Amino acid sequence: MASLSGPISPTSLEMFKPGVEEFNPSKLLLLSNHQEGLLYPTILGSLELLSFKRERSLNLQRDKVCLLHQESHLLKLRGTGTDTTDVLLKQPTAISVNCCHDGTFTTWEQDRMPKTSTAPTLTESSGSLVTRLILIPRLTLSIGIQVAMRLFRLGFRLARYSLKVTILKAQEGLLLIPDLLRVHPIEPLVQDRVVEPILAIEPLPLV
């Protein structure tokens, strides 16, 4: 007591009395922490903070430290010619920060985000697809030939006339194939064989 300067009042000596002091709401003060911008309730003559307030302040402090670290990381990129616009947009969703309870930054960790592939999915191999494209005309032609042979045997006049028109249209299409290929080229998957124009077509026996 002798080391204290100035007179000592009786009210100031009451703070150093031994024993448990009764809680007095008038002694509750709100001391502002200018560094973190938070309010800490404390009691005169006590240096301890309330547990729930302290835990809450540490959580806020942890978030502040992590945000400041992100900003400082972007500030390092400034002036080096790096565009940080995309980084600001992608960081909140693609990057998470781990901090200790005392507000100390620990590690950066990439989130496990599902990666979507933009490449087209091939359901069939190119070889099987080409084989199917080759088999389809053969099947169609075989069915058409069988139907034509039956109609020729029956001798229906209308059927023979319709077949003649169909065959003439098919011959015209075969002659136009080279010109159509220049306007509408075939896809690379099917363009394995060079289509040659048919110069002479033998006339079919139409009765």
UniProtKB/Swiss-Prot annotation:
Belongs to the coronavirus I protein family. The keyword Plastid does not apply. GO terms for cellular component: virion component. InterPro entries: Corona_nucI, N2-like_embe-CoV. The gene encoding this protein is included within the N gene (alternative ORF). It is found in: Virion. It comes from Porcine hemagglutinating encephalomyelitis virus (strain 67N). Pfam families: Corona_I. This is Protein I. Structural protein that is not essential for the viral replication either in tissue culture or in its natural host. Keywords: Virion. It comes from the Viruses. The keyword Repeat does not apply.
